Amino acid sequence: MPTPLHDAHPIVAAVRQFVDKEVVLAASSFEHADTYPHDLVARMRELGLFGSLVPAEYGGLGLDVATYARVIEEICRGFMSLAGVINSHTMAALIVLQNGTDEQKRRLLPRFASGAARGGLCLTEPHAGSDVQAIRTVAKRQGDGYLISGSKMFVTNGREGNTFALLALTDASAKPRYRGMSCFIVEKGHAGLQVVKSIAKLGYKGVDTAELLFDSFPCPADNLVGGVEGRGFKHVMSGLEAGRINIAARAVGVAQAALEEAARGAHGVAEPPAALASIAIRVDGARLLTYWAAGMKDRGERCDLEAGMAKLHASESAQEAAADAIRMLGGPGQATSGIVERLYRDTPLMMIGEGTNEIQRTIIAKNLLQRHGERLGALTSLEAEPEERRQMALAVRQLVEREIAPAAVEDDRAGRFPSVSLDKLKALGLFGAVIPQDMGGLNLDGPAYALIAEEIGRGSASVAAVLKDHVDAADLILRLGSAEQRQRLLPALASGKLRGGTLRRLREPARREINALSHADGFILTGDGLIAGPGRHADVFVLLAPVDERLIAFLLEVGQPGFVLAEPFETAGRRGADLWHTQLRGCVLPSSQTLGGEVAPTSAAIAGAQASARVREAAAAVGLAQAAFEAALRYSQQRSAFGVPICQHQAIQLKLADMATAIAVARLLTQRAAAEDGAGDAAPAHAAMAHLHAAETAYMVTLESMRIHGGYGYSAEFPVERYYRDASALLAGEAGDEALRRSIARHAAAGATLDGGPA
């Protein structure tokens, strides 16, 4: 995601100012007239954007990919077409930078950086789109050069540009075919190149997109990229990796614009529509995934899988955001006097460009299978984590695979409380996960616990839920309790001598709401709309209840007069978690049994604790989704249909790609919220986003895993039916509560900056 480091580069502020003061005002006139924005392009040249990724030694800005993506996002927030001029040019420059000879770099890169060379890509042909290997354009050697013949389609900058990276066949007999492909830098100014026509389009107007015809066009051998034939396909693919990140950044910018327009439409409305929350979650998820891939690219890591996921998710999110904005705005949303209808027309391009999303899904699935076998290693990699955090997570992962996951099968069948697994976690010190070390705890930060909670959730949703209840109670006492309460309770909770739990209200009309009234020197509580987790196995519970329009945190102990565990709460999923319906029958509590005692906690402190609890639930949901995905990945390789493993069937590949991408987004949303640890104005909204998306992802992935397994997925002999049942607990909780969506919608409608995006 964008970090202060990315925004700190002066070019980001300069581009934002350029967009706000010049681009936004002029975009509609250029777009409706479909005229090339010469003045805006000239300004981008003045800003140095044509040399964005060209190193300073060649006259460029030398930006990293993440900062460049930030620049592209800003431009697309104002006018997506304008970014096309830069992106196509930059891809051509990157091909030379990454693959050219030293002489080619010295000769061409300064011209690309200055904008004297206006670049583009000549890849697509009338009969070869996403399948680049199907090209027919040929380059025949003649003397000291080549003669190029063929037709290229959808060339951005085709009319206004002058220097193109072109892929052609130099050996049509090569097997496999890509080994006969070479990449050339072709420059206008010679006979044999004709701009056949500019292509009329649904959107992406104002920038020229042309068909070019090459008829024995001469190209000097010095312009063969790298100086060696047969390497062109690799050269082009290396450029497309960055190109997909750029497409993702463009999509994020357009989605951000749609969010802002939808938020403006909801401004002043007493209760913003919940649909605004969906847009905000999509925008944030797309942004996080895009900058995750960009960061990997900058670190020199292989990121073709991650770049493809970013392109897929961001482009789909932009399309959905634009459509939702039109739904929200109604008639004004489709008016040509506004910009939402332009966004609606622009977004399909990003689902098609740099490889259609359907082809992208098949590539993602094949990549997952080839690179990671039966484990989604790249998406659970801990290499970038601090050593101590990594070692703890690895220890938990080993315990999960060796003991917790196998035990979960029998515990679920018997409906048995997972005491043995919990004792194993207690031995690792995880009962004191968030408790300070001087009180016997581990003092794990938010991201560390999220990693661990995901691993536990991957092994057993019930174990993850019970541990979460305990940690939630400890965290509330830590954040809200008095010094005496912390000293008395936290060491015992850390060691496991006391087990904590929470009381949460049910969304159940037949149950009475909790009523807490001031009474003498304390409070009296009545009501029966509560679930206690983990029921009979907890010693102390924490309840948040409203008193005089503010929340108070109450401590209730098992055996407290008026506090009754009424009956077991049997559920489809998370069997054995020992949930109980409870009743408060005039339960009288002195002030000493409120967290903080006489000093009531602030609303911000309570909101922070609630946010962190939602993050812990999100992390466990990601783990559940991960388990279901791994099961599907294994089964798809083991099961055959029509003579081949079902993972080779496109329908299965599309599902695997969507499942993996959704999990990656859920994990990134969760880790972002975990890093905030409930602190900051945006933390509650970010935690809610993570919670909602992770819960929906767990449901989607468990269901899709069942589809892939077929009848076996419905059978109790396979774990998938348990995963699907466990997902129901997530939907029945806060994730199904519209109040949580409305809180996100209010955050978006208020114009809060979402992860670096413009307000």
Predicted regions, residues:
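C-terminal helix-coil-helix/basic helical segment that borders enzyme active sites and/or dimer interfaces
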Residues: 24-32, 263-273, 280-315, 326-334, ...
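Glycine-rich phosphate/pyrophosphate-binding beta-alpha loops
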Residues: 77, 153-158, 204, 348-354, ...
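Glycine-rich beta->alpha junctions and the first turn(s) of the following alpha-helix
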Residues: 2-6, 10-11, 77, 183, ...
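A short core secondary-structure module
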Residues: 145, 149-195, 522, 526-566
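A short, Trp-centered hydrophobic/proline-enriched beta-strand micro-motif
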Residues: 115-123, 167, 495-507
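A structural signal for short hydrophobic beta-strand segments in well-ordered beta-sheet cores
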Residues: 137-140, 516-517
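Glycine-rich phosphate/cofactor-binding loops in nucleotide/flavin-utilizing enzymes
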Residues: 70, 91, 329-385, 452, ...
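Internal helix-loop-helix
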Residues: 46-115, 156-163, 297, 345-346, ...
